[in-house]
């Protein structure tokens, strides 16, 4: 996959076959053991402030070299492990537009975000955790094929929404797609250009590959689109 990412690999280190074959007899204990090898971005995850660099710096002007082979000396996502809590708001864009999911390549603009919030009767406030549903994940699950979900064409946020994020002073933006922003990207001169602005310039945490089907169903049933995010 992109960036050397791959699906989780499950490896058996010891099995019942080993036990029956006598491979464990010397230790006197017969057992099964295993391990999983996986990139941390192969599933639901947060893009921390040390994930994207603009030139040679990250958010707040820190040198990109502060993220090295030993980890992040600045802006590691672990710093937020006890503080990622606040008012969550779901913006269900396909439901607002009258469908089950958005087509690949559909760019969600500021008008979509504002229109959806108004239709749902919810107001975006500073510090909110805004969760944008496209329905792409559910569409893949329903057809039984992930296709090019990882780094392929996808509905997502347009470049202009960086201004919306900054203006509304939200704490984080989340989505049910691989990379939140629309793909193909709006510019052919930069890969994931929205990331370049939102993380290292605005300083926003970004949640990706969020499973939203159940949350969306409950919000629609109750006609309540705000909740405790933690």
Where in the sequence are the language-model features?
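Active-/binding-site microenvironments in catalytic and ligand-binding cores
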Residues: 1-230
